[in-house]
Regions:
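Glycine/charged-rich beta-loop-alpha catalytic/anionic-binding loops adjacent to active sites
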Residues: 15-17, 74-78, 190-194, 212-221
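A generic structural signal for short beta-strands and their flanking turns/coil linkers
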Residues: 13, 33-35, 45-47, 57-59, ...
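Active-site/ligand-binding-proximal alpha/beta "capping" segment
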Residues: 159-208, 216-220
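Hydrophobic side chains in well-ordered alpha-helices
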Residues: 25, 89-92, 207
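Structured adenosyl-cofactor binding patch, chiefly the S-adenosyl-L-methionine
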Residues: 205-247
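N-terminal positively charged helical leader segments and presequences
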Residues: 1-68
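RNA substrate-binding interface of SAM-dependent RNA methyltransferases
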Residues: 70-167
Length: 247
Protein backbone atom coordinates (compact mmCIF):
# COMPACT_ATOMS: atom_id res chain seq x y z
CA UNK A 1 0.00 0.00 0.00
CA UNK A 2 1.43 3.44 -0.94
CA UNK A 3 2.45 5.76 1.89
CA UNK A 4 0.09 8.67 2.65
CA UNK A 5 0.95 12.32 3.24
CA UNK A 6 -1.01 15.53 3.72
CA UNK A 7 -0.29 18.71 1.77
CA UNK A 8 -2.34 21.69 0.64
CA UNK A 9 0.09 22.49 -2.18
CA UNK A 10 -1.76 20.61 -4.92
CA UNK A 11 -2.74 22.38 -8.15
CA UNK A 12 -2.64 21.99 -11.93
CA UNK A 13 -1.48 18.39 -11.84
CA UNK A 14 1.49 19.01 -9.53
CA UNK A 15 2.12 18.95 -5.79
CA UNK A 16 4.83 19.76 -3.26
CA UNK A 17 5.51 18.13 0.11
CA UNK A 18 7.58 20.08 2.63
CA UNK A 19 9.09 19.86 6.09
CA UNK A 20 9.16 16.76 8.26
CA UNK A 21 7.06 14.67 5.89
CA UNK A 22 9.31 15.51 2.95
CA UNK A 23 12.32 14.53 5.05
CA UNK A 24 10.60 11.28 6.03
CA UNK A 25 9.78 10.36 2.43
CA UNK A 26 13.17 11.26 0.95
CA UNK A 27 15.57 10.31 3.75
CA UNK A 28 13.83 7.73 5.94
CA UNK A 29 11.73 5.91 3.32
CA UNK A 30 14.39 6.58 0.65
CA UNK A 31 11.82 7.52 -1.94
CA UNK A 32 12.96 7.49 -5.56
CA UNK A 33 11.91 9.21 -8.75
CA UNK A 34 8.86 7.42 -10.12
CA UNK A 35 7.68 6.11 -6.73
CA UNK A 36 3.96 6.46 -6.05
CA UNK A 37 2.33 7.81 -2.88
CA UNK A 38 -1.14 8.98 -1.87
CA UNK A 39 -1.51 12.70 -1.14
CA UNK A 40 -4.45 14.15 0.79
CA UNK A 41 -5.41 17.82 0.77
CA UNK A 42 -7.20 17.66 4.13
CA UNK A 43 -10.68 18.11 2.63
CA UNK A 44 -11.47 14.42 2.05
CA UNK A 45 -9.94 14.41 -1.45
CA UNK A 46 -7.06 12.07 -2.29
CA UNK A 47 -4.58 12.04 -5.16
CA UNK A 48 -2.33 9.36 -6.58
CA UNK A 49 1.04 11.11 -6.91
CA UNK A 50 4.33 10.19 -8.58
CA UNK A 51 7.65 11.61 -7.37
CA UNK A 52 9.23 13.85 -10.01
CA UNK A 53 11.94 15.63 -8.05
CA UNK A 54 13.67 16.35 -4.74
CA UNK A 55 14.74 19.70 -3.29
CA UNK A 56 16.08 20.93 0.03
CA UNK A 57 13.44 19.54 2.41
CA UNK A 58 10.88 19.27 -0.42
CA UNK A 59 9.54 16.52 -2.64
CA UNK A 60 7.78 17.31 -5.93
CA UNK A 61 5.09 15.24 -7.62
CA UNK A 62 2.89 14.91 -10.64
CA UNK A 63 -0.65 14.07 -9.54
CA UNK A 64 -3.63 12.37 -11.13
CA UNK A 65 -7.15 13.81 -10.78
CA UNK A 66 -8.43 13.74 -7.21
CA UNK A 67 -11.11 11.41 -5.90
CA UNK A 68 -13.19 11.33 -2.70
CA UNK A 69 -11.59 9.60 0.27
CA UNK A 70 -13.33 6.30 1.01
CA UNK A 71 -12.24 6.52 4.65
CA UNK A 72 -14.48 9.43 5.65
CA UNK A 73 -17.76 8.55 7.42
CA UNK A 74 -21.16 9.87 6.39
CA UNK A 75 -21.56 11.64 9.75
CA UNK A 76 -19.53 14.49 11.26
CA UNK A 77 -18.71 13.57 14.86
CA UNK A 78 -17.39 15.91 17.54
CA UNK A 79 -16.26 14.29 20.78
CA UNK A 80 -16.55 16.54 23.84
CA UNK A 81 -14.55 14.81 26.57
CA UNK A 82 -14.33 15.59 30.27
CA UNK A 83 -10.62 16.20 30.85
CA UNK A 84 -9.11 12.97 32.27
CA UNK A 85 -5.89 12.36 34.17
CA UNK A 86 -2.52 11.33 32.75
CA UNK A 87 -2.40 10.15 29.13
CA UNK A 88 -6.01 9.01 28.82
CA UNK A 89 -6.94 11.89 26.53
CA UNK A 90 -4.16 10.87 24.15
CA UNK A 91 -5.70 7.40 23.93
CA UNK A 92 -9.15 8.83 23.22
CA UNK A 93 -7.80 11.11 20.48
CA UNK A 94 -5.71 8.43 18.79
CA UNK A 95 -8.44 5.79 18.74
CA UNK A 96 -11.21 8.32 18.12
CA UNK A 97 -9.48 9.41 14.91
CA UNK A 98 -9.25 5.76 13.84
CA UNK A 99 -12.97 5.32 14.44
CA UNK A 100 -13.91 8.38 12.39
CA UNK A 101 -14.15 11.39 14.74
CA UNK A 102 -13.57 14.78 13.11
CA UNK A 103 -13.22 17.06 16.14
CA UNK A 104 -12.21 16.74 19.79
CA UNK A 105 -13.11 19.28 22.49
CA UNK A 106 -11.82 18.58 26.01
CA UNK A 107 -13.53 20.41 28.87
CA UNK A 108 -13.29 20.84 32.62
CA UNK A 109 -16.35 20.10 34.73
CA UNK A 110 -17.23 19.91 38.41
CA UNK A 111 -15.91 16.41 39.06
CA UNK A 112 -12.79 16.54 36.87
CA UNK A 113 -9.72 15.35 38.75
CA UNK A 114 -7.27 16.95 36.30
CA UNK A 115 -6.56 20.69 36.52
CA UNK A 116 -5.55 23.12 33.74
CA UNK A 117 -1.78 23.17 33.21
CA UNK A 118 0.29 24.15 30.15
CA UNK A 119 -2.74 23.61 27.93
CA UNK A 120 -1.36 25.33 24.82
CA UNK A 121 1.73 23.12 24.93
CA UNK A 122 -0.42 20.03 25.46
CA UNK A 123 -2.72 21.07 22.62
CA UNK A 124 0.17 21.05 20.16
CA UNK A 125 0.95 17.49 21.20
CA UNK A 126 -2.70 16.42 20.99
CA UNK A 127 -3.03 17.78 17.46
CA UNK A 128 0.18 16.04 16.47
CA UNK A 129 -1.25 12.77 17.80
CA UNK A 130 -4.41 13.34 15.74
CA UNK A 131 -2.30 14.11 12.66
CA UNK A 132 -0.21 10.95 12.97
CA UNK A 133 -3.30 8.84 13.65
CA UNK A 134 -5.01 10.27 10.55
CA UNK A 135 -2.05 9.30 8.38
CA UNK A 136 -1.79 5.84 9.92
CA UNK A 137 -5.45 4.90 9.50
CA UNK A 138 -5.99 6.43 6.06
CA UNK A 139 -8.19 9.42 6.87
CA UNK A 140 -8.86 12.00 4.18
CA UNK A 141 -9.14 14.95 6.57
CA UNK A 142 -7.09 16.22 9.49
CA UNK A 143 -9.13 15.89 12.69
CA UNK A 144 -8.53 18.74 15.13
CA UNK A 145 -8.26 19.07 18.90
CA UNK A 146 -9.49 22.31 20.46
CA UNK A 147 -8.12 24.00 23.56
CA UNK A 148 -10.15 22.85 26.58
CA UNK A 149 -13.34 24.65 27.56
CA UNK A 150 -13.11 26.01 31.12
CA UNK A 151 -16.40 24.67 32.49
CA UNK A 152 -19.56 22.78 31.58
CA UNK A 153 -21.47 25.99 30.97
CA UNK A 154 -19.14 26.71 28.05
CA UNK A 155 -19.89 23.24 26.69
CA UNK A 156 -23.64 23.88 26.77
CA UNK A 157 -23.27 27.25 25.05
CA UNK A 158 -21.51 25.54 22.13
CA UNK A 159 -24.19 22.95 21.38
CA UNK A 160 -26.49 24.85 19.01
CA UNK A 161 -24.19 24.10 16.05
CA UNK A 162 -25.03 20.36 16.06
CA UNK A 163 -27.96 18.40 14.65
CA UNK A 164 -27.84 15.86 17.48
CA UNK A 165 -26.16 16.11 20.89
CA UNK A 166 -25.72 12.89 22.87
CA UNK A 167 -25.15 13.37 26.59
CA UNK A 168 -23.77 10.10 27.96
CA UNK A 169 -24.99 9.67 31.53
CA UNK A 170 -24.64 6.80 33.96
CA UNK A 171 -28.26 7.25 35.03
CA UNK A 172 -29.49 6.04 31.65
CA UNK A 173 -31.49 7.64 28.87
CA UNK A 174 -33.09 7.08 25.47
CA UNK A 175 -31.94 4.29 23.12
CA UNK A 176 -29.12 5.44 20.86
CA UNK A 177 -30.63 3.70 17.84
CA UNK A 178 -33.86 5.68 18.23
CA UNK A 179 -32.11 9.04 18.62
CA UNK A 180 -30.03 8.49 15.49
CA UNK A 181 -33.07 7.40 13.47
CA UNK A 182 -34.95 10.56 14.42
CA UNK A 183 -32.11 13.01 13.68
CA UNK A 184 -31.84 14.90 10.39
CA UNK A 185 -29.05 17.18 9.14
CA UNK A 186 -29.96 20.87 9.09
CA UNK A 187 -27.95 21.54 5.93
CA UNK A 188 -29.07 18.42 4.09
CA UNK A 189 -25.52 17.09 4.08
CA UNK A 190 -23.68 15.26 6.85
CA UNK A 191 -25.43 14.77 10.17
CA UNK A 192 -23.44 16.75 12.76
CA UNK A 193 -23.30 14.78 16.00
CA UNK A 194 -21.79 15.87 19.30
CA UNK A 195 -21.00 13.23 21.92
CA UNK A 196 -20.45 14.40 25.50
CA UNK A 197 -18.73 12.08 27.98
CA UNK A 198 -17.48 12.78 31.48
CA UNK A 199 -14.15 12.57 33.27
CA UNK A 200 -13.33 10.11 36.06
CA UNK A 201 -15.88 11.65 38.44
CA UNK A 202 -18.74 11.71 35.95
CA UNK A 203 -21.29 14.53 35.89
CA UNK A 204 -23.08 16.42 38.63
CA UNK A 205 -26.89 16.30 38.53
CA UNK A 206 -26.94 20.04 37.80
CA UNK A 207 -24.72 19.49 34.76
CA UNK A 208 -27.12 16.86 33.43
CA UNK A 209 -29.93 19.40 33.80
CA UNK A 210 -27.87 22.05 32.01
CA UNK A 211 -27.23 19.67 29.12
CA UNK A 212 -30.93 18.85 28.77
CA UNK A 213 -31.88 22.55 28.77
CA UNK A 214 -29.27 23.15 26.04
CA UNK A 215 -30.97 20.54 23.83
CA UNK A 216 -28.82 17.49 24.51
CA UNK A 217 -30.42 14.05 24.42
CA UNK A 218 -29.47 11.86 27.37
CA UNK A 219 -28.32 8.39 26.37
CA UNK A 220 -27.30 5.43 28.51
CA UNK A 221 -24.36 3.13 27.85
CA UNK A 222 -25.76 -0.11 29.19
CA UNK A 223 -25.77 -1.65 32.68
CA UNK A 224 -21.99 -1.49 33.17
CA UNK A 225 -19.95 1.49 34.35
CA UNK A 226 -17.39 2.39 31.68
CA UNK A 227 -14.08 4.09 32.37
CA UNK A 228 -13.72 7.66 31.15
CA UNK A 229 -11.35 6.60 28.36
CA UNK A 230 -13.62 3.69 27.33
CA UNK A 231 -16.99 5.47 27.21
CA UNK A 232 -16.26 7.92 24.36
CA UNK A 233 -14.83 5.20 22.15
CA UNK A 234 -17.74 2.88 22.89
CA UNK A 235 -20.25 5.54 21.88
CA UNK A 236 -18.36 6.50 18.72
CA UNK A 237 -18.19 2.82 17.74
CA UNK A 238 -21.93 2.43 18.30
CA UNK A 239 -22.71 5.59 16.30
CA UNK A 240 -20.53 4.47 13.41
CA UNK A 241 -22.09 1.01 13.44
CA UNK A 242 -25.68 2.27 13.54
CA UNK A 243 -25.03 4.76 10.73
CA UNK A 244 -23.45 2.11 8.50
CA UNK A 245 -19.89 3.41 8.78
CA UNK A 246 -18.29 0.23 10.09
CA UNK A 247 -19.58 -2.07 7.37
Amino acid sequence: MPHRYFTTEISDGTAVLRGADAHHLSRVMRGRLGDTVILCDGSAVEYTATITGFGDETVEFSVEPGYPSAAEPTVDVTLLVGYPKQDKLEQVIRHGVELGCDHFVPFFSRYCVAAPKKEEQKNERYNRIAFEAAKQCGRGILPDVALPLPNFGAVCRSLDQYDLVLFCYECGGAPLRQLLAEATPADGKKLKIAIITGAEGGFAAEEAEMAAKAGAKTVGLGPRILRCETAPLAVVSAVMTLTGNLE
